[in-house]
């Protein structure tokens, strides 16, 4: 009913949303175009007595991948391109110079797909953007225990030693490098080549250092160590610096100079990068060229001057959590840094090979790509920033690609991150979402980019604003993107103060939206302005910039929540996170109450299929759509040819999380299309919009206690109409191997006369299950035999086999069977052949209906577990006879403060009755106080008038209605809030969680049952549970749990046989964990044993642990 309804807008934003995954694609493109060349240019040429080998940074090429993206997934390989680099060899032989250029294979570079992820070993992976401290110099103030003030300057680099300048209580400035002892700034500066005269003349306040030196020299302990403060010469300074940096190694002036150069001035070992140099120059007002990425003496001199200025009250300390001091490292930059590691390893390998005596080895053996490939494989396989892509639904995929993580190499760790790093900083407005972050130890460390945010060339986050002049918003100049630092210098106002009603009317009537008469202006009343991270009140004349949209401060997932401003932030966080956990349903349905971003999220996440160009649809089936267009053959001729493009659809494919990826065509044949038109819907979209759940008729009321504590009561209509039925595809794999007794074999010839043939019924002649077969638990998916060792036969058996012509079984059946609890249809079978092995993948699709124990949630953090499924005739029903689909607990609203769900369900009811879909964007108070309430009441009143059902809007209790009990036919005593809510079914399903254990595996050391469903484990009886048994005096039950049900090895075997044979249960023995504890104490050289004292002789005898019962 809702599918073809009209979507009505309640707001209009002139600025179109950017491509939401461009951050991934742009970064990788930059790596291919510039990053590769940069890293190749940093490889040092190899020189010998008569040759020179150079890697050319230009002319490299990438070959087209051998397999397509889909084939890479099926064959469990990586989607990558071979990198070929030109290598120039200059050889001098008997006075002649020979130059040869060869194209050498340098390994395979994984390629990013058009959707912004990688295919590594058949699995989709995402490289998460890392937000780190930007390279540069940072000043901070420190207070010691005696409340004395000191200052510190930290120089952060991309690569190399960390350097810190700090003042002490006497005012002296010291330098620390890595873990070396502190060194006087005068020694460092003079060792770098500056004279004392230059140093003191360059400082604005040299008297500060003079005074500090006088105070130190007045102290006894420094009178004999003057050389540690003031060097006599440059040589003296170099030698003293070397003794501090390498105290255990003897050296001379030349060695000291080399160590200093390698520490701070060697571009291969120390690098502040372009961003670091720009920040150093800006902070210290230096004229150093931007291509110089190492430290210079002038950097130390200017940092010293700034530190002295801080002591005199000049300058400012830095806020390290401000976004101007942080930058984002995207996929391309992270891969580039890993490629650098691989090239450095290759360089060392090549140096080692050419240093051997003999002829110059061949180029293919010299340029072995293994170090480069190993480095990339290590990054994609084990780096915490390379993650298994969340493919539960398109929104989860999109959010994963826009994630910002402070963790990973070069970042923070969960243990060391304090509250200051995790908290919301004012500079994050419009750049990082203040709501969407995980719950738990990663809270605040992992975030999500705001909807309109983008990255600049330095990795800084920028936010768009419209410029304002004298209260007029300059739309015609488009949005201006500001960094956090630039935003601090101007006065801005939020985008939710613009009244856009005139603009919407003009757009609806087809008039120019930039007409001064209709475009929004700032209101002539006191406004809440923001400048330098502080709020204050002012007039529209003080405003420099205005936000482009009310939702620009939040992320994509959060902006999909209607009436967000009426929800508590904690519940909005849960709602944002749980939308990503929604399972794609068999029958999709777009929400009645949306926010307007549903279509763009579906398109940018790759959830729908769009036309690649303008043309006409000439062929449609379940697997492909053909779009035909005409292209001119020659520019000057009139001849034209037809160009056809095949758009292939994904059909019943498995996602990383086991959900079903399926695209179905919705475009009719012979339909003209333009570029970007919708051709096919995905498994989580409806009509091109993201559709993660269903619109249900809900009632907020208690029902026999079945919705106590967030439990959810549902109607059986949800099952019979397949409203929440979802498809889940599981992949089962078999690999044949060569054993020492012979090769394993996939075959159908396993069944013997005495065997049950039923489980083998679906195998084809190859021994692999047929596609389309319906399989049950225990059915054989792949028939496989493994050779086993034959026993020596007796003469009698040999005679029997000779008479009847039978041979003994020389193999055992190791077939792959359907596990317990799984039944479904085989949707695909794939075979991958290698030189020695054969791998077969079987994909089984399960259809899961909603059941008791499944988790459901709304978009406002209102989550719960299905507790009971009630016949539809027993559910409460409306006054027109419509039974309610779901009953929720009304006590779940007031304390959680997520009132947005009430607004949503009431407006949804009005929209459903009027046949409308409504787009309601957040922060609508610009239209007046209580704007949401007025909108809801107006729509409910309109619905009651249009339909004639006046009970939809009762002025005595608006938003509520009298319900009738389906069991008795009596009307409930009080009016109940009813409405259409958009409810999601989450991936936390009872089928994946329910588990029971009778007997199973035990730990090898403690002999106690393992834990967890995957290991067929049991439930742990912990310390507090033991106390509970003790408190109730249940001694025998406790003894049984701690012994035969746990780690009394002999006892558990005896008790099982006793129960089977009906004998009396034996006595309990000693737990194995007790023996382990005694052995561990003995391993600590403690003489501890177990002794028995005889009652008759009173003699004490030691009991052997191994013989102990």
Curated annotation (Swiss-Prot):
Superkingdom as given in the UniProt entry: Eukaryota
Organism field: Nephroselmis olivacea
Keywords for the protein's UniProt record, in alphabetical order: Chloroplast, DNA-directed RNA polymerase, Nucleotidyltransferase, Plastid, Transcription, Transferase
Family: Belongs to the RNA polymerase beta chain family.
Name of the top EC class for this enzyme: transferase
Descriptive protein name: DNA-directed RNA polymerase subunit beta
Subunit structure: In plastids the minimal PEP RNA polymerase catalytic core is composed of four subunits: alpha, beta, beta', and beta''. When a (nuclear-encoded) sigma factor is associated with the core the holoenzyme is formed, which can initiate transcription.
Cellular component annotations (GO), alphabetically ordered: chloroplast; DNA-directed RNA polymerase complex; mitochondrion
InterPro entries (UniProt xref): DNA-dir_RNA_pol_bsu_ext_1_sf, DNA-dir_RNA_pol_su2, DNA-dir_RNAP_su2_dom, DNA-dir_RNAP_su2_hyb_sf, RNA_pol_bsu_bac, RNA_pol_bsu_CS, RNA_pol_bsu_protrusion, RNA_pol_Rpb2_2
Matching SUPFAM superfamilies: beta and beta-prime subunits of DNA dependent RNA-polymerase (SSF64484)
Catalysed reactions, as listed in the record: RNA(n) + a ribonucleoside 5'-triphosphate = RNA(n+1) + diphosphate
EC number assigned by the record: 2.7.7.6
BP GO annotations: DNA-templated transcription
GO MF entries: DNA binding; DNA-directed RNA polymerase activity; ribonucleoside binding
Keyword Chloroplast: yes
């Amino acid at each position: 009913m809702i599918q073809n309804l009209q979507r009505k807008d309640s707001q209009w934003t002139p600025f179109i949303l950017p491509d939401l995954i461009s951050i991934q694609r742009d970064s990788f493109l930059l790596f291919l175009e510039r990053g590769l060349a940069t890293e190749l240019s940093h490889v040092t040429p190899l020189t010998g007595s008569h040759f020179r080998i150079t890697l050319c940074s230009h002319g490299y090429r990438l070959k087209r991948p051998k397999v397509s993206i889909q084939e890479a997934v099926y064959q469990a390989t990586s989607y990558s391109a071979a990198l070929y680099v030109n290598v120039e060899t200059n050889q001098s032989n008997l006075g002649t110079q020979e130059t040869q250029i060869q194209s050498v294979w340098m390994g395979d570079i994984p390629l990013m797909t058009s959707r912004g992820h990688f295919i590594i070993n058949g699995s989709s992976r995402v490289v998460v953007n890392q937000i780190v401290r930007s390279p540069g110099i940072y000043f901070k103030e420190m207070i010691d225990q005696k409340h004395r003030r000191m200052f510190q300057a930290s120089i952060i680099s991309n690569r190399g030693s960390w350097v810190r300048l700090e003042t002490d209580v006497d005012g002296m400035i010291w330098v620390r490098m890595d873990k070396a002892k502190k060194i006087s700034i005068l020694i460092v500066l003079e060792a770098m080549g500056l004279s004392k005269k230059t140093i003191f003349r360059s400082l604005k306040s040299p008297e500060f250092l003079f005074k500090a030196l006088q105070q130190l020299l007045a102290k006894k302990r420094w009178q004999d160590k003057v050389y540690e403060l003031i060097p006599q010469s440059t040589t003296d300074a170099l030698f003293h610096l070397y003794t501090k940096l390498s105290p255990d190694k003897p050296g001379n002036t030349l060695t000291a100079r080399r160590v200093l150069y390698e520490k701070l001035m060697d571009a291969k070992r120390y690098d502040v990068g372009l961003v670091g140099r720009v920040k150093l120059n800006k902070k210290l007002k230096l004229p150093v060229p931007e291509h110089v990425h190492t430290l210079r003496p002038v950097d130390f001199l200017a940092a010293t001057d700034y530190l002295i200025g801080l002591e005199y009250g000049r300058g400012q300390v830095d806020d390290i959590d401000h976004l101007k001091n942080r930058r984002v490292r995207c996929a391309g930059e992270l891969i580039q840094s890993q490629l650098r590691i691989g090239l450095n390893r290759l360089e060392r390998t090549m140096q080692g090979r050419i240093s051997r005596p003999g002829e110059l080895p061949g180029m293919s053996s010299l340029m072995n790509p293994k170090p480069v490939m190993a480095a990339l494989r290590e990054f994609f396989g084990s780096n915490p920033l390379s993650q298994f892509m969340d493919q539960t639904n398109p929104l989860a995929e999109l959010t994963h690609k826009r994630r910002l993580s402070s963790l990973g190499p070069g970042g923070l760790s969960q243990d060391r991150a304090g509250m200051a790093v995790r908290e919301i900083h004012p500079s994050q407005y419009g750049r990082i979402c203040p709501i969407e972050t995980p719950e738990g130890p990663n809270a605040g460390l992992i975030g999500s980019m705001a909807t309109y945010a983008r990255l600049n060339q330095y990795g800084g986050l920028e936010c768009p604003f419209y410029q304002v002049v004298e209260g007029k918003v300059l739309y015609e100049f488009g949005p201006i993107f500001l960094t956090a630092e630039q935003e601090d210098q101007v006065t801005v106002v939020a985008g939710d103060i613009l009244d856009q009603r005139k603009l919407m009317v003009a757009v609806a009537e087809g008039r120019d939206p930039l007409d001064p008469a209709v475009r929004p202006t700032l209101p002539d009343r006191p406004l809440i302005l923001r400048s330098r991270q502080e709020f204050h009140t002012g007039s529209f004349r003080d405003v420099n910039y205005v936000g482009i949209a009310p939702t620009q401060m939040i992320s994509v997932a959060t902006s999909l929540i209607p009436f967000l401003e009426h929800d508590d932030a904690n519940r909005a966080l849960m709602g944002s996170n749980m939308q990503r956990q929604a399972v794609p349903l068999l029958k999709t349905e777009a929400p009645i109450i949306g926010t307007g971003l549903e279509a763009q999220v579906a398109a940018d996440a790759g959830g729908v299929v769009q036309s690649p160009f303008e043309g006409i649809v000439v062929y449609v089936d379940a697997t492909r759509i053909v779009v035909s267009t005409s292209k001119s053959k020659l520019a000057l001729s009139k001849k034209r040819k037809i160009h056809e493009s095949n758009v292939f659809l994904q059909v019943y494919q498995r996602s990383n999380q086991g959900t079903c990826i399926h695209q179905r065509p919705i475009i009719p044949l012979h339909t003209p299309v333009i570029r970007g038109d919708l051709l096919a819907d995905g498994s989580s979209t409806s009509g091109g919009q993201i559709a993660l759940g269903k619109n249900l008729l809900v009632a907020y009321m208690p029902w026999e206690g079945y919705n106590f504590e967030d439990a959810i009561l549902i109607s059986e209509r949800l099952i019979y109409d397949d409203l929440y039925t979802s498809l889940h595809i599981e992949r089962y794999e078999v690999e044949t191997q060569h054993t020492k007794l012979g090769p394993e074999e996939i075959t159908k010839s396993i069944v013997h006369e005495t065997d049950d043939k039923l489980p083998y019924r679906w195998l084809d002649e190859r021994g692999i299950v047929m596609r389309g077969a319906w399989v049950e638990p225990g059915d054989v998916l792949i028939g496989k035999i493994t050779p086993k060792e034959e026993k020596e036969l007796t003469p009698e058996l040999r005679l029997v086999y000779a008479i009847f012509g039978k041979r003994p079984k020389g193999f055992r059946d190791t077939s792959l069977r359907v596990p317990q609890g799984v039944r479904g249809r085989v949707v695909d079978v794939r075979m991958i052949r290698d030189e020695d092995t054969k791998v077969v993948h079987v994909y089984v699709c399960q259809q899961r209906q909603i059941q008791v124990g499944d988790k459901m949630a709304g978009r406002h953090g209102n989550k719960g577990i299905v507790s009971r499924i009630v016949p539809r005739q027993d559910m409460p029903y409306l006054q027109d006879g419509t039974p309610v689909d779901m009953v929720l607990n009304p006590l779940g609203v007031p304390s959680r403060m997520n009132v947005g769900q009430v607004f949503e369900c009431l407006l949804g009811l009005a929209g459903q009755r009027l046949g409308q879909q409504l787009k309601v964007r957040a922060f609508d108070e610009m239209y007046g106080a209580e704007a949401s309430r007025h909108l809801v009441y107006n729509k409910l009143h309109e619905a009651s008038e249009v339909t004639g059902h006046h009970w939809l809007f009762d002025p005595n209790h608006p938003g509520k209605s009298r319900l009738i009990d389906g069991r008795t036919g009596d009307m409930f005593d009080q009016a109940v809030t009813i409405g259409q809510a958009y409810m999601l079914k989450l991936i936390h399903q009872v089928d994946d969680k329910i588990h029971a254990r009778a007997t199973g595996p035990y730990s090898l050391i403690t002999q106690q049952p393992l834990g967890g469903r995957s290991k067929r484990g049991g439930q742990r009886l912990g310390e507090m549970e033991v106390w509970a048994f003790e408190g109730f005096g249940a001694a025998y039950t406790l003894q049984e749990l701690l012994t035969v049900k746990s780690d009394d090895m002999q006892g558990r075997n005896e008790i099982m046989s006793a129960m089977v044979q009906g004998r009396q249960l034996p006595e309990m023995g000693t737990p194995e964990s007790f023996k382990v504890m005694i052995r561990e104490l003995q391993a600590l050289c403690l003489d501890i044993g177990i002794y028995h004292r005889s009652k008759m002789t009173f003699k004490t005898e030691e009991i052997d642990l191994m013989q102990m019962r």
